[in-house]
Amino acid sequence: MFILTDVTAGSKVFLPDELDVKQRGIVAISAYTATGDLQGLKQALKEGLTAGLSINEVKEELMHLSAYCGFPRSLNGINTFNDVLSERKSQGISDPEGPKPSKVADSGKYQTGKKVLESLTGRPESGAKTGYAAFVPAIDTLLKEHLFNDLFTRGVLDYKQRELTTVSALIALGGVESQLAGHIRICLNVGFTARQLEQAISLIEIKIGKKQADTGRQVLKNVLTSGN
């Protein structure tokens, strides 16, 4: 990774095409939560807070992950985070709370979720349902109303941060290449570069393993060469 160092201040300056320290923290927290490595997660949480993630940003990331690695992993992550905060407080470390989440609307949830998804993909959703949405319509409703409305409209994390969370979890989990490809396309649509995604994969290789990283690289390559 190319990093410029301010010699006088001793600080690292990340170039525009690099993941910044907060984004790298998001990647690590997501990957460790998804795989259930709570010891690794504990360290990643400390590093994420030190990198500038607020308490509420981390809470939102861990909640967001419930949609991708299940409530048990999400809840374990939340409990681990609570322990980390208690430990830091006992050490006299005060972490910023950060912005509070927005109130989620109870009405029009499906349409709001549909619009969020269209914004993420950059494509209008029209015509007859296909695939899983046609086979089990209720799961399409759940995705729109819960994931893309209840979670995405809470704010605190922007769309880029939420999608980086998602892609990192899917790479770490493995075996979900179809979904990973879709979310890599979304990441590219919301402003991430291929280089930044490659950096996320390299970080996951260090934290989680080469097998998961190699699969992530292949999926990224397939998306880039397909052009859609």
Set out the residue ranges of the language-model regions.
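Short, structured motif recognition centered on aromatic/hydrophobic residues
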Residues: 24-32, 58-62, 161-171, 180, ...
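Winged helix-turn-helix DNA-binding recognition segment
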Residues: 53-57
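Acidic, glycine/proline-rich low-complexity segments that act as flexible tails and inter-domain linkers
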Residues: 1-22, 34-50, 71-159, 172, ...
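Short conserved catalytic/interaction loops centered on acidic-Pro-aromatic/His motifs
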Residues: 44, 177-185, 198
